[in-house]
């Protein structure tokens, strides 16, 4: 019985990682914001230079680059897979991972948590790339 439970947990792990889609995430953030996503606002936020966050990460493009279909690079030199789902199909399919990274990166770049509307806008733009 114990072996069965362990095997079930191991087999369920990968299925749980892909618990969502970009469209589902956007819909959830739109509902929380009470407004539809705007991809153009997401593009503008992604490409803009911010002043509220860390000085060494003034923009999303600092690490991800302006072309989100290409790999980016962390400040330590580690490669970051492309943000665009067209280049990285499993991007934005794990809701916990999306929340973790949006939380970390919004605070690093903007100096605060992104609002649900900003998250919807960013994902709407990224999903279209």
Curated annotation (Swiss-Prot):
Residues making up the signal peptide according to the UniProt record: 1-17
Keywords of the record: Disulfide bond, Electron transport, Heme, Iron, Metal-binding, Signal, Transport
The keyword Iron is annotated on this UniProt entry: yes
Pfam families: DUF1924 (PF09086)
Gene3D superfamilies in UniProt: Cytochrome c-like domain
Post-translational events: Binds 1 heme c group covalently per subunit.
Source superkingdom: Bacteria
InterPro entries, per the entry: Cyt_c-like_dom, Cyt_c-like_dom_sf, DUF1924_SHP
Bridged cysteine pairs (disulfide): 106-114
Binding site for heme c: 60, 63-64
GO MF term list: electron transfer activity; heme binding; metal ion binding
Tagged with keyword Membrane: no
Role noted for this protein: High-spin cytochrome. Transiently bind oxygen during autoxidation, which occurs with a half-life of 3 minutes with a 4-fold excess of O(2). Also binds carbon monoxide, azide and cyanide.
Record-given protein name: Cytochrome c-type protein SHP
Upper taxonomic lineage: Bacteria, Pseudomonadati, Pseudomonadota, Alphaproteobacteria, Rhodobacterales
Gene that this sequence comes from: shp
């Amino acid at each position: 019985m114990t072996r069965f439970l362990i095997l079930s947990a191991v087999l369920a792990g990968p299925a749980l990682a892909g618990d969502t889609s970009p469209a589902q995430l956007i819909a959830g953030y739109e509902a929380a914001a009470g407004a539809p996503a705007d991809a153009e606002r997401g593009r503008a936020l992604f490409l803009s230079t911010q002043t509220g966050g860390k000085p060494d990460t003034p923009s999303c493009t600092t690490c991800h680059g302006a072309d989100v279909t290409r790999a980016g690079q962390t400040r330590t030199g580690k490669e970051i897979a492309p943000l665009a789902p067209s280049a990285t199909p499993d991007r934005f399919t794990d809701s916990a991972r999306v929340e973790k990274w949006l939380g970390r990166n919004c605070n690093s770049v903007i100096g605060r948590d992104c609002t649900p509307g900003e998250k919807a806008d960013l994902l709407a733009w990224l999903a279209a790339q």
